[in-house]
Structure formats: structure tokens, C-alpha cells
């Protein structure tokens, strides 16, 4: 009887030990799967951010090369599809355009903060609430006589706009510009109200409709040094050339994101190795 009881007790202990080893192995395997999945995911994200870094670098180099080209006169934009073709062929190239600004059809877009690389943006005392000013221009001289284009003249603080300090030159002007693409409407950005002239984001087609420009028109943006107008308190403030190569997510951010993901992948790999020992 005693032998039978002792044998049963040894059997129970053996089964318990086996169950413990089995449970430990299961937990170890689960940990390896968990950390292995983390390693694979973070490696993928790190590689993706690395590719984005080199892609962003290439875009910046292409823009800088285009901006170094000699300025040229804005080509004719009349005719179906011509405006889109001109915009595509002259992306980020400095252009000149001559004509008369139609201030009666001026539109403000915003609210907006001042453009980067300007004293207004960097000065903490400068008002940050303002608007972009878009004004139609009727071209003068040459084959482009009478054509109309949309000119994004720059940014103005709300207080200066309310006080009537916006500069509205009369007569013929010659502007240094770059072609500007339409913006994508943000998820929480209201719809533009073309009829009332309330614009919250840059939509070339809607702005052209408001200005009565056929064939969609082309939108150009004036460029400057970003400092002189601010010092002289002359509005609107044109975007400087240096800001044309800016992106919301910079190359440095992509590099930082990649380093973070690769660090997490390395930590996950170490944890997986420890679990396998």
C-alpha cells in the first residue's frame, strides 16, 4: 500500500514538472513571437522612413536645381489645358509676369500664419493671425496681352488688413513669381464659399471661377527676401525663395524617425535572443 502511494505521488510530481516545463516553453515561444513580430514591424518602418529620407532629399535637390535656372517670362496660359501644361513644365522655376492687378477681385485666404524663413514668422512679437492675398492680374505687352492669371501676393496680418495697410499698387507691375499648385483640403478645413468669396484653402479652379477666368487659369506666387517688407511694414509679405524647398516633414525628421524604429528593432532582437537562451 505504501509503495503504491509513493509511486502515485512520484507520478503526480512528474506530471506537474512536465506541465511546468510545457507552460514555460509556451510562454517562451509566445514571447519570441511577440518580440519577433515587433522586430519585423519596426525594421520595415525604419526602412520605409529611410526611403522617404532619400526621396525627400531628391525632391529638394530637384527644386533647388530648378530655382537656379535663369528666370523666364511666364508663357501664355490661354486655351484649354494650356494652364495645366504651363504649370507642370515650370514647377519651381523663377518666372516674371507683367500686368495690372485687379484689386476689385481680390480674395483673402485663411486664416494663415506667416510664411517660414521670414522675420514675421521668427519674431515672437509679430501677430501670427493673418491671411494670404490672391489678386487677378491682367497681362500687358506681347502675345500674352489681356491674359489673366491669379497672383498669390503674400501674407498680411489681420490687424494690418483691418487697418487698411495692405499695399495695392496701381499701374503696370512686373513680378517675380513661381507657379503654385492647389492645396488639398484638410479633413477639418471648411469648404470654400466661391459665391461669397470666403476661401479657407487654395483651390486654383475655385479662385479662377471667382475671378471670372476661363480655362481654370494658373496660380502664381510672388517671391521676395522675406525681410524688407516686414521691416518697412509693407504688406503683403512675399514668401522668400528659401521657403520654397521646405516640407512639413523635413529630411531631418525622416532620419530621426528611421533611427527610432531601428533602435526599437535592435531592442526587440535582444529580447528575442534572451528568451531563446
Model-flagged regions — what are they?
Residues 2-277:
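Surface-exposed, charge/polar-rich loops and edge strands
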Amino acid at each position: 500500500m505504501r509503495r503504491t502511494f509513493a509511486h502515485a505521488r512520484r507520478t503526480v510530481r512528474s506530471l506537474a514538472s512536465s506541465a511546468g516545463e510545457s507552460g514555460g516553453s509556451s510562454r517562451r515561444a509566445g514571447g519570441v513571437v511577440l518580440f519577433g513580430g515587433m522586430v519585423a514591424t519596426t525594421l520595415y518602418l525604419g526602412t520605409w522612413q529611410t526611403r522617404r529620407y532619400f526621396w525627400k532629399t531628391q525632391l529638394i535637390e530637384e527644386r533647388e536645381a530648378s530655382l537656379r535656372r535663369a528666370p523666364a517670362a511666364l508663357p501664355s496660359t490661354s486655351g484649354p489645358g494650356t494652364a495645366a501644361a504651363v504649370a507642370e513644365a515650370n514647377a519651381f522655376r523663377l518666372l516674371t509676369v507683367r500686368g495690372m492687378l485687379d484689386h476689385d477681385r481680390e480674395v483673402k485666404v485663411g486664416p494663415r500664419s506667416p510664411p517660414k524663413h521670414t522675420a514675421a514668422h521668427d519674431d515672437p512679437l509679430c501677430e501670427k493671425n493673418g491671411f494670404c492675398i490672391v489678386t487677378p492680374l491682367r497681362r500687358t505687352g506681347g502675345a500674352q496681352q489681356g491674359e489673366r492669371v491669379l497672383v498669390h501676393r503674400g501674407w498680411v496680418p489681420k490687424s494690418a488688413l483691418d487697418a487698411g495697410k495692405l499695399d495695392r499698387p496701381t499701374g503696370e507691375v512686373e513680378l517675380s513669381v513661381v507657379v503654385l499648385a492647389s492645396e488639398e483640403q484638410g479633413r477639418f478645413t471648411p469648404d470654400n464659399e466661391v459665391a461669397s468669396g470666403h476661401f479657407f484653402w487654395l483651390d486654383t479652379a475655385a479662385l479662377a471661377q471667382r475671378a471670372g477666368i476661363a480655362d481654370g487659369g494658373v496660380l502664381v506666387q510672388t517671391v521676395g527676401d522675406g525681410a524688407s517688407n516686414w521691416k518697412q511694414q509693407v504688406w503683403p509679405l512675399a514668401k522668400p525663395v528659401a521657403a520654397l524647398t521646405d516640407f512639413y516633414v523635413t529630411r531631418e525628421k525622416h532620419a530621426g524617425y528611421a533611427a527610432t524604429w531601428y533602435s526599437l528593432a535592435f531592442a526587440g532582437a535582444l529580447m528575442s535572443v534572451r528568451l531563446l537562451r
